Amino acid sequence: MKYIPGVAWVALLALGCATGPAGAQSVDIKTIVSVGGPPVVLNQNSQLNMAGVFMIGGSTSATVTQNGTNNATGILQFGGTNSASIGQAGMNNFAFVGQTGQSATSLVSQLGTMNTGAVVQFSAVNNSTIVQNAP
């Protein structure tokens, strides 16, 4: 039997999903790195949504909205004033927010069968809300 490296298997799997029948699972994966940039707003509507946002700057702001079967978001913010908002609707939802600065505000809202959310804040002023609902 011929050996196929792990990277080749991942490529074949991705190709199979991309060129499969109309009922194949759709995937949307985004990684955003922002240094002193404008606010990040990301909307994802695939069956599998994954987002990673890493921000450094005086004032950071990120909003991620995901509607799909499986949703995962990680936001890391290092700034003076940090703001993060994650909205997820799907069967399985995972959200993580990490913030360090003078003030940190975050909101995580999840509607699904299995919801996991965590907020870690290291700031002088911290405000966080996690709302999880199962249908």
Where would I find each of the regions flagged by the language model?
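N-terminal secretory signal peptides that target proteins for export/translocation
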Residues: M1-Y3
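Sec/Tat signal peptide C-region and signal peptidase I cleavage site
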Residues: P5-V7, L15-A24
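Short helix-onset patch at the extreme N-terminus, typifying the N->h transition
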Residues: G6-W9, K30-T31
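Low-complexity repeat regions of mature extracellularly deployed or surface/particle-associated proteins
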Residues: A24-P135
